[in-house]
Each structure stands twice: as structure tokens, then as C-alpha cells.
């Protein structure tokens, strides 16, 4: 679809009011018809809408911004997998487009967060080390899920620092695929407290018995909030192991915590341990 033709379809769409909200000129039937017509243009329509995006907060940006979301959503509500994949490939191809504002590049990631699948992962992985985009990129990969997404995060983790490193390990912890175990065991010794805590959550979530040593050691040396969070991860791992029938492994974690949590401030941990031990007796 030619850009001029696309503009004619987009121009009648609702414009935001003085508060930046779409509250007037809302005719759902007409909007749905327009969106379906734009969607018929396939990948070219999506690329055209992206080209039309303007500066964040401007009227010029609002209509193509709205249309782009509606068109991507159209593929989902009509259950058109071929169209969904085609649209998401178009979105992914523009994530690295530096002629777009950071805001709009992040917006493309947000669309991929809920509409994207494996086809979006390589493009999302390429900008994980960009501090301005890392939030949107990592969140999208975590939402897509699976090893294809996790592998992109693990690759980026090797070079990530600061905010990017925290976002990436958080996303890996949410995905909790077994292939990330080695990264979690290394990251739990990281110099950044937030990275260590996220790594402990990842180790708890992958539910592997051999993660217990790393978690217990980290919890023993931690203080304050970090000690609380990593101890909680130890308890979560024990619960997962018990649920999987690995009672001996769960018991070892509980017994270790029982011996080391003697301070009055950690009596609630001892109580949780007693409940856990009773459940696997």
C-alpha cells in the first residue's frame, strides 16, 4: 500500500483530546473497517505506519501510533497467524532503526511484547545493551518466553553492565529455563546486589537440586534485604523440590536453614522451615 493511500486511511482516525486521551470521534465500526483495510496491505502497511510515526506527544504521532496498535491487534483477534508473523517481522525489522525516536523504538518492542513470538527474538536481542531500550527489549523477550528468547538474553549477559545487566538477569529469572543455570550460579556472586537477588530467584525457579549449594552459600553471606530475599529463594527451591518428589534434597535445604537461622529477627524463617519439614515427613 502506497504511503499516500495509507495516510488517507489514517487521517480520519480519532485524535487525542487536550489530555492526550482518545475520548471523542470514537466510531468502533468505522475504526474496525479502516483497520481491516490497512491490514490487507500486509507488511508494507506496517512499515508505512512506522514511517509515519512522529515525535512523541505530537498529533502527527498519535494517529499512526494508534493505527499500528490496532493493526497488530487485528491479526490477533482474527486469529490470522500468517498475518501476525508478517506484521511482527516488520516491527522487529525496525527496532534498530535509529531514525526513529527512542520512544517509538520502545513502542515497537511493546507491540512485540504481546504479539511477537520466536520471529522477534533475534532483533530484540540486538539492542539489549542499549540503556535507553533495555527495559522494553528485556520485557518483550520475557513475555515471548522459551529458549529462543532466553538464548538472546544469555548472549547479551556476557557484555552487560549496570541497568542492562539487571534487566537481563531479571528477564532470565522470569523465564527460568534450565539452560540458564550456569549464568545464575555465576551471577549470584556478582558485585551488584540486585543482580545477585535476581540470580537467586532464577536458581529457585529452575528447581534443580544442585542449585542449593549456591543459594545457601549466598544467603549465608548476605545481609539485610538481600539475605531476606535469597533466603526466600532457598525456601522456594525447597518447596519445588519437595513437590517434585525430591524430599531428601528439600530436607537438606530446610535443615541447613534450621541450623543457621538462630537470630530473633529470623524466627519466621525457622517457622517456615518447620512447616516445610512437617510436609515432607
Please name every model-derived segment.
Residues 1-33:
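N-terminal "cap/leader" segments of large eukaryotic alpha-helical scaffolds
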Residues 5-9, 48-53, 90-95, 123-125, ...:
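Buried hydrophobic core positions in alpha-solenoid tandem helical repeats
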Residues 19-20, 55-59, 94-98:
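Helix-loop junctions that connect tandem helical modules in alpha-solenoid scaffolds
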Residues 24-41, 61-82, 102-117, 123-126, ...:
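Structural detector for internal amphipathic alpha-helices that build alpha-solenoid repeat scaffolds
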Residues 44-61:
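Short, charge-rich amphipathic alpha-helical segments embedded
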Amino acid at each position: 500500500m502506497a504511503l499516500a493511500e495509507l495516510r488517507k486511511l489514517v487521517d480520519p482516525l480519532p485524535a487525542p483530546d487536550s489530555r492526550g486521551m482518545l475520548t471523542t470521534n470514537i466510531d468502533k465500526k468505522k475504526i474496525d473497517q479502516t483497520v481491516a483495510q490497512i491490514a490487507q496491505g500486509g507488511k508494507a502497511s506496517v512499515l508505512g505506519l512506522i514511517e509515519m510515526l512522529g515525535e512523541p506527544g505530537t498529533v502527527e504521532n498519535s494517529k499512526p501510533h494508534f493505527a499500528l496498535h490496532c493493526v497488530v491487534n487485528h491479526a490477533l483477534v482474527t486469529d490470522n497467524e500468517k498475518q501476525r508473523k508478517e506484521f511482527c517481522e516488520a516491527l522487529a525489522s525496525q527496532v534498530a532503526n535509529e531514525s526513529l525516536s527512542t520512544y517509538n523504538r520502545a513502542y515497537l518492542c511493546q507491540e512485540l511484547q504481546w504479539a511477537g513470538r520466536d520471529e522477534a527474538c533475534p532483533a530484540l536481542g540486538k539492542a539489549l545493551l542499549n540503556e535507553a531500550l533495555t527495559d522494553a527489549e528485556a520485557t518483550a523477550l520475557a513475555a515471548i518466553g522459551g529458549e529462543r528468547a532466553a538464548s538472546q538474553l544469555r548472549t547479551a549477559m556476557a557484555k552487560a553492565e549496570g541497568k542492562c545487566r539487571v534487566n537481563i538477569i531479571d528477564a532470565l529469572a522470569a523465564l527460568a529455563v534450565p539452560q540458564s543455570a550456569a549464568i545464575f550460579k555465576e551471577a549470584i556472586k556478582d558485585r551488584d546486589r540486585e543482580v545477585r537477588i535476581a540470580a537467586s530467584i532464577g536458581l529457585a525457579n529452575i528447581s534443580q537440586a544442585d542449585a542449593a549449594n549456591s543459594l545457601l552459600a549466598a544467603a549465608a553471606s548476605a545481609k539485610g534485604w538481600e539475605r531476606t530475599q535469597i533466603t526466600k529463594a532457598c525456601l522456594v527451591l525447597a518447596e519445588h523440590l519437595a513437590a517434585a518428589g525430591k524430599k531428601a534434597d528439600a530436607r537438606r535445604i530446610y535443615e541447613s536453614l534450621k541450623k543457621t537461622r538462630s537470630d530473633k529477627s529470623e524466627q519466621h524463617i525457622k517457622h517456615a522451615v518447620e512447616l516445610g519439614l512437617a510436609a515432607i515427613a
